[in-house]
Structure formats: C-alpha cells, structure tokens
Amino acid sequence: MYADRDLPGAGGLAVRVIPCLDVDDGRVVKGVNFENLRDAGDPVELAAVYDAEGADELTFLDVTASSSGRATMLEVVRRTAEQVFIPLTVGGGVRTVADVDSLLRAGADKVAVNTAAIACLDLLADMARQFGSQCIVLSVDARTVPVGSAPTPSGWEVTTHGGRRGTGMDAVQWAARGADLGVGEILLNSMDADGTKAGFDLALLRAVRAAVTVPVIASGGAGAVEHFAPAVAAGADAVLAASVFHFRELTIGQVKAALAAEGITVR
C-alpha cells in the first residue's frame, strides 16, 4: 500500500486519470477500438465517451503540428468544449501567445507548449503572465541520452518533433526551468517508454519530481493496471495513457480501482 507515503493521492488531492488523444488533421490516430461509435476516429465522439466513463481530464495533442507547421485544430476544440465539461488540455503547434489565446477562446482549459518554448525561453513566461500559470503546461519529451552523444547531468535529454530530434538540453533541468518561468504543470513523456506498454519511466519521474513543485503528469509506457500506482509513488500527480484506453485494453474505471486499492485517492 502506498497511502502512508508523502505522495499525491495519499489523503491529499485526488490523482487524475487522463486519456490522451493524438490528433492528425482533425482525426484521432494510433487507432481506436470502441464499439457502437459511429466514427471511431472522431475526437469529439471519443472525448464524450471518456467523459462518460469518468476521465478527470482530456488531452488533445496535434501530432503533426510541430513538425509540419499546421495550426492546431480550433474547430475540434470548439466542438469538444460544447459537449464535454471536464478540463481539456490542447497541445501541438503552439508557437505564440496568440495561439494560446485562440485555443482558450475556443474552449481549451489549458494549453501545452513544447518545441516553441525551447526555441524562445521568454515564451513560457509571457504566456504564464498573460493567461495565468494554471493555463500553461510545459510538455517535455524526454529520452535517455543516446550512446555517442554528449551527456547531460541527469542522463536524460529533451527531444522535439515527436522524439525524432535530440536537443542536448537536460530534461530534468528544463522541467525545473519551466516551473521557474511560471508553467502550472509538467507533462512528462518518456520517449524511451512510449509505446512499450512496459510501465512508466519511474526513475525519470522521481528525478523531475525532486526538481519541481508543480504537478507532474506521467506519460509514456502504460500497459497494465499495475503500472499506474508505481507512477504515483514515484511522484506523478496525474497519469496519462492513450492506446490502452483506445483499444479497450483498460478502462478509466479499472485504472481508478487499481489506484484506490493501493490507498491512492481518486475522484
């Protein structure tokens, strides 16, 4: 049992369970396997299903936006906000303060920033100042520094373009810098664990948890209900998954039940 630990969900704030929808040109990718849906690739319809199943929040990531220069899908956000009333975070292709403004006006509650913040350090501070820290999420795609590359202090580096490009920036230091600049939470995605279904990167979570005081969302690696409580024990305030939910390998309810069985508070 984890309940006696000083960790999220142990008698404190409830740990959030967040499905992530990767969206390409307005369609959910990575596949979905819901029965009784008219269109299993429609993000709005999927969002409504997850809302009904008890998801605490939703995250939309435009997986093509940063690498191909597409603007984020405002119309999808508008349609979702009209039907779904849990918090919605949107990321992908967010480059300017104006982009954040457009997404918030369309109905997003929070906006995740990744590549653009690396290119312009002032951007996070400007966004937090204008819209409030609670609206700004720093998305960190971290991987173990490849053999032959210059090492970083923590052993992890920040990547961009869906993990395809290394930056040489230390991932833990970058998360801490983002918190200092005013972001309200860190979306920490392990590119090493992503897609493996072997569990979250607990060492990475512990390292970032020790470096920041803002909430941390664990992402990358979820494959079984047993994987979620250790992520919380390692410091996650929220747990995010995509394909295990989309393919019905796990449900929101099963994950919450597994967390509750370990003494972790859920909604």
Swiss-Prot record:
| GO BP terms, alphabetized | L-histidine biosynthetic process
One family from Pfam that matches here is: His_biosynth
Enzyme class, top EC level, equals lyase
Q: Catalytic activity, per the record? A: 5-[(5-phospho-1-deoxy-D-ribulos-1-ylimino)methylamino]-1-(5-phospho-beta-D-ribosyl)imidazole-4-carboxamide + L-glutamine = D-erythro-1-(imidazol-4-yl)glycerol 3-phosphate + 5-amino-1-(5-phospho-beta-D-ribosyl)imidazole-4-carboxamide + L-glutamate + H(+)
Which residues are the active-site ones?
22, 141
Q: Give the subcellular location.
A: Cytoplasm
Q: Which InterPro entries match?
A: Aldolase_TIM, His_biosynth, HisF, IGPS_HisA/HisF, RibuloseP-bd_barrel
Q: What is its main location?
A: cytoplasm
Look up the EC number in the record and give it: 4.3.2.10
Give the UniProt entry's GO cellular component terms: cytoplasm
Task performed by this protein: IGPS catalyzes the conversion of PRFAR and glutamine to IGP, AICAR and glutamate. The HisF subunit catalyzes the cyclization activity that produces IGP and AICAR from PRFAR using the ammonia provided by the HisH subunit.
Family, per the entry? Belongs to the HisA/HisF family.
Its name, as the record gives it, is Imidazole glycerol phosphate synthase subunit HisF
The species this protein was found in = Mycobacterium bovis (strain ATCC BAA-935 / AF2122/97)
